[in-house]
A protein has these predicted regions:
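Hydrophobic cores of alpha-helical transmembrane segments in multi-pass integral membrane proteins
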Residues: 1-10, 24-49, 59-88, 97-156
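Hydrophobic alpha-helical bundle architecture
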Residues: 93-95
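Juxtamembrane membrane-water interface segments that cap and precede transmembrane helices
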Residues: 13-23
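Membrane-interface segments at loop-to-transmembrane junctions
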Residues: 18-20, 55-62
Length: 156
């Protein structure tokens, strides 16, 4: 009963946002971000472990394992967003700040895939420190772009 006054203020979604691709695109990207957040927490935990190499190895293995589905989901999410953009606006990519930062985030998280050829990633502590810092790209993509840069992803 208390919310009936607010219901009249809710406006319908813009037609471009009524695509079924929207929910799949957003859900896929959010699942990737959740896995990246889990890697952030694993990284913080790994840096707190003192003198227990067995635990550190297990945490590192879990973080590296989670990297694959996280990057895969982000890639699929970006691809679905590009398809949706083509259907809605007639082009796949417009270098919108959100698109650009999503691509930057993808590249940042793809770097650890080359851990055998990048010396610093051979040390678990360095790997986890990188994963903690990498989450900054997710924060910028999710929050920073909306509040600082605007673009096509600002629907307010």
């Amino acid at each position: 009963a208390m919310m009936t006054g607010n219901v009249s203020q809710i406006s319908p979604l813009m037609p471009v946002l009524q695509s079924p691709l929207l929910s799949v695109h957003v859900m896929t990207v959010m699942c990737a971000y959740a896995l990246f957040a889990l890697q952030l927490l694993l990284g913080i935990y790994a840096l707190m472990i003192k003198g227990n190499n067995y635990s550190l190895d297990k945490v590192t293995a879990l973080s590296q394992f989670l990297l694959y589905p996280a990057v895969f989901l982000l890639t699929i999410g970006i691809f679905l967003g590009a398809v949706w953009a083509n259907v809605s606006w007639g082009n796949y990519w417009s270098w919108d700040p959100k698109e650009t930062w999503a691509l930057i985030t993808l590249m940042v998280y793809a770097v650890p895939f080359h851990s055998t050829s990048i010396f610093m990633f051979r040390k678990p502590q360095c790997y986890h420190l990188y994963m903690i810092c990498a989450f900054l790209s997710v924060v910028i993509t999710y929050f920073g772009v909306n509040y600082l840069l605007g673009g096509m992803h600002s629907y307010a």
